[in-house]
């Protein structure tokens, strides 16, 4: 469950390390985002000479949440951290690698590029 001001790690090699959610997309009253949802983020920490700079405002898709997700078979999955992958204007990942596992729910949301780059899909 990600809301405005939530801090997330960046799970790609775009150069950003930490981001903060500044808006949850999908309706004016929408408060929370879960795995597979698109949010607007501000880069809070970035590596020097990288594709993104501190202060950049971008869209990102949530790939891991510390809050558990209930699946249709009744099982739950949760991760240790909140993490997101930065997206460009066309909705494609900015980075060329994904770090750490991602949730299977991304496949249902048609983020095939992220699923194929991820080392593990849980």
Curated annotation (Swiss-Prot):
Keywords: Ribonucleoprotein, Ribosomal protein, RNA-binding, rRNA-binding. InterPro entries: Ribosomal_uL14, Ribosomal_uL14_bac-type, Ribosomal_uL14_CS, Ribosomal_uL14_sf. CDD domains: Ribosomal_uL14. Gene3D superfamilies: Ribosomal protein L14 (2.40.150.20). It comes from the Bacteria. GO terms for molecular function: large ribosomal subunit rRNA binding; structural constituent of ribosome. Pfam families: Ribosomal_L14. GO terms for cellular component: cytosolic large ribosomal subunit. GO terms for biological process: translation. HAMAP family: Ribosomal_uL14. PANTHER family: 50S/60S RIBOSOMAL PROTEIN L14/L23, LARGE RIBOSOMAL SUBUNIT PROTEIN UL14M. Part of the 50S ribosomal subunit. Forms a cluster with proteins L3 and L19. In the 70S ribosome, L14 and L19 interact and together make contacts with the 16S rRNA in bridges B5 and B8. Belongs to the universal ribosomal protein uL14 family. Binds to 23S rRNA. Forms part of two intersubunit bridges in the 70S ribosome. This is Large ribosomal subunit protein uL14. It comes from Oleidesulfovibrio alaskensis (strain ATCC BAA-1058 / DSM 17464 / G20) (Desulfovibrio alaskensis). The gene is rplN.
């Amino acid at each position: 469950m990600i809301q405005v001001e939530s801090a997330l790690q960046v799970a790609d090699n775009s150069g950003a390390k930490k981001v903060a959610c500044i808006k949850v997309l999908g309706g004016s009253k929408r408060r929370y985002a879960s795995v597979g949802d698109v949010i607007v983020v501000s880069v809070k920490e970035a590596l020097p000479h990288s594709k993104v700079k501190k202060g950049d405002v971008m869209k990102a898709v949530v790939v891991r949440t510390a809050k558990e997700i209930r699946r249709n078979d009744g099982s739950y999955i949760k991760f240790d951290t909140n993490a997101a992958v930065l997206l460009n204007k066309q909705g494609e990942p900015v980075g060329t690698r994904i770090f750490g596992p991602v949730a299977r729910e991304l496949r249902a949301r048609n983020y095939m590029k992220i699923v194929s780059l991820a080392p593990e899909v849980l």
